[in-house]
Amino acid sequence: MSQSNPVRIFVTHAWQNSDDYLRVFEYLESQRNFFYRNYGTPDRRPQGDREALRENLRQQITPAEAIIALSSLYQAHQDLLTFQLRYAQASHKPVILLKPFGAPQEVPKALLDLADEVVEWDERALVDAIRRQARHEETTRWDTIEFKLD
């Protein structure tokens, strides 16, 4: 993965920039040497009926290599989120589910069943999940801890 070959992602949305939606990009931007292209366009809601909205979502999801699902959308936009994840699954796109931010809420089983991987809100965990699911890259890391023996 490089600037010339960024990972293509789609982050689930309900046609608005929620705090969680924006937080995903803060996390991705904080990681060095991680390049991505977002195919989601929550700020451009198409005109038309329910099918027009779904077709627009299909067009956003199709070029993506990985889907990042915000479980926080489920309660208010269950049908829309479920549609996005089912379409991703039918298109053989890996789904990375982010648990609810900051609250010890249970993730609904319906979402867990549609996810390939579930991660906490952690920059490293999110980027590693994207690398594993989208590009099948090895993401094993070792932290070096230095200490002095007295």
Indicate where each model-derived feature is located.
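Short catalytic/ligand-binding loop motif for oxyanion handling, primarily in non-cytosolic enzymes
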Residues: 18-21, 77, 103-108
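Conserved beta-strand scaffold positions in the cores of enzyme catalytic domains, especially
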Residues: 36, 95-97, 118-120
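Conserved beta-strand-loop-alpha-helix hinge of the TIR/SEFIR fold
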Residues: 60-103
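A charged, well-structured terminal subsegment
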Residues: 126-145
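Glycine-rich, charge-decorated loop segments at or immediately adjacent to ligand/cofactor-binding or catalytic sites
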Residues: 102-118
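Structural motif corresponding to alpha-helix initiation and N-cap regions
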Residues: 50-54, 82, 123
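Short, glycine-/small-residue-rich phosphate/pyrophosphate-handling segment
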Residues: 113-129
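Conserved N-terminal substructure of TIR/SEFIR domains
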Residues: 1-63, 143-150
